[in-house]
């Protein structure tokens, strides 16, 4: 059985980075966590470290924006045809100027750890 998680909505057409670059930035941040032998991911929160790395990279790219990053972690270990029932809802709202501010959602899956990360990045023009 294959579990499918879809991400809908978002407003990335006015992003300070092209969508492709945002995806690369997130993936590279995650890969660097996995490759760093000094980080013990069993004791440190992967999501908190990922948020920190993503925000650091975004801030280096442009100081014209304030950034907010959110990571929702799903542990999909043990899901099978008999036990494939889970529910997740995450809502976020912001008051912004739609021509300058926006939001980007991304799903990052780690097949090795049976975890899926739902990442949201918001940018607000200063």
Swiss-Prot record:
The modification N-acetylserine is found at residue 2. Gene3D superfamilies: Tctex-1. The keyword ATP-binding does not apply. Keywords: Acetylation, Cell projection, Cytoplasm. Signal peptide: none annotated. It comes from the Eukaryota. It is found in: Cytoplasm; Cell projection. GO terms for cellular component: cell projection; cytoplasm. Belongs to the TDA2 family. This is Topoisomerase I damage affected protein 2. It comes from Saccharomyces cerevisiae (strain YJM789) (Baker's yeast).
């Amino acid at each position: 059985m294959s579990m499918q998680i879809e991400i809908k909505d978002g407003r990335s057409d006015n992003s300070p980075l092209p969508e492709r670059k945002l995806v690369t930035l997130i993936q590279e941040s995650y890969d660097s966590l996995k490759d760093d032998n000094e980080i013990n991911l069993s004791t440190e929160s992967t999501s908190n470290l990922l948020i920190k790395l993503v925000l650091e990279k975004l801030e280096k790219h442009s100081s014209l924006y304030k950034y907010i990053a959110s990571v929702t972690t799903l542990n999909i270990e043990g899901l099978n045809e008999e036990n494939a029932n889970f529910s997740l809802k995450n809502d976020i709202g912001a008051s912004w100027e739609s021509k300058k501010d926006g939001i980007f959602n991304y799903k990052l899956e780690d097949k090795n750890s049976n975890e899926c990360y739902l990442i949201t990045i918001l940018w607000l023009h200063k």
